[in-house]
């Protein structure tokens, strides 16, 4: 499957979620309304692009004539390297699905993120580990979070004060990342809830 743009991924996710919730795909008008397109024609162009990339099929003559070709996997999605500026759960970032009970983590894990680097080694998060992440923006100071600064994603301990966020490493060889909320784009992707190493929950 060819990589999707961020906007195409939004359209794909909307269709998938709509089918999951209602049992049928959305109309072009519904896609346009939900995603803020000016007209159903704009939605149609995105559908054609998705069809060219092989993730869906357009069935002519039906307002809901959309069939997804990417089979839904079971298990927790495993996210590998994240390209700058793209959604964390974009289809092209998912390396596969891990068969693990999400309920073994508290709160439950929504996805696994492959750790890159040793900046959190002092608390047992090592390069190559799979970090279990609960997707939320409701986090507190002192918690280990998956954060996005501008276009980059990182795992660090959160310390927020006023308009400044410090993302603290757990390795003395690394320096804290300081974010000025007045000048930089910052968001929380989720809360770290556990680690899997070599197939075993730690």
From Swiss-Prot:
Which InterPro entries would you find in this protein's record? LexA, LexA-like, LexA/Signal_pep-like_sf, LexA_DNA-bd_dom, LexA_repressor, Peptidase_S24_LexA, Peptidase_S24_S26A/B/C, WH-like_DNA-bd_sf
GO MF terms listed in the record are:
DNA binding; serine-type endopeptidase activity
Q: Report the protein name in the record.
A: LexA repressor
Identify the species of origin. Enterobacter sp. (strain 638)
Q: Where is the active site?
A: 119, 156
Give the record's keywords alphabetically: Autocatalytic cleavage, DNA damage, DNA repair, DNA replication, DNA-binding, Hydrolase, Repressor, SOS response, Transcription, Transcription regulation
Its quaternary organisation is: Homodimer.
The answer to whether UniProt assigns keyword Transferase to this entry is: no
- Write out the catalysed reaction: Hydrolysis of Ala-|-Gly bond in repressor LexA
**Main role?**
Represses a number of genes involved in the response to DNA damage (SOS response), including recA and lexA. Binds to the 16 bp palindromic sequence 5'-CTGTATATATATACAG-3'. In the presence of single-stranded DNA, RecA interacts with LexA causing an autocatalytic cleavage which disrupts the DNA-binding part of LexA, leading to derepression of the SOS regulon and eventually DNA repair.
Q: Where the record puts its DNA-binding region(s)?
A: 28-48
């Amino acid at each position: 499957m060819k990589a999707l743009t961020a906007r195409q991924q939004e359209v794909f996710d909307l269709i998938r979620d709509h089918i999951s919730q209602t049992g049928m795909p959305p109309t072009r008008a519904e896609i346009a309304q939900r995603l803020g397109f000016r007209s159903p024609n704009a939605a149609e162009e995105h559908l054609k692009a998705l069809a060219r990339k092989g993730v869906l099929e357009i069935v002519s003559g039906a307002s809901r004539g959309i069939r997804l070709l990417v089979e839904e996997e079971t298990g927790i999605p495993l996210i590998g390297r994240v390209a700058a500026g793209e959604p964390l759960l974009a289809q092209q970032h998912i390396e596969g699905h891990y068969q693990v009970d999400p309920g073994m983590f508290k709160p439950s894990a929504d996805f696994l993120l492959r750790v890159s680097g040793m900046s959190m080694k002092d608390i047992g998060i090592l390069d190559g580990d799979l970090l279990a992440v609960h997707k939320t923006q409701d986090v507190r100071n002192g918690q280990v979070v998956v954060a996005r600064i501008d276009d980059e994603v990182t795992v660090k301990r959160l310390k927020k004060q006023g308009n400044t966020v410090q993302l603290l490493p757990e390795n003395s060889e690394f320096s804290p990342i300081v974010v000025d909320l007045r000048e930089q784009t910052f968001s929380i992707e989720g809360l770290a809830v556990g680690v899997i190493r070599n197939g075993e929950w730690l």
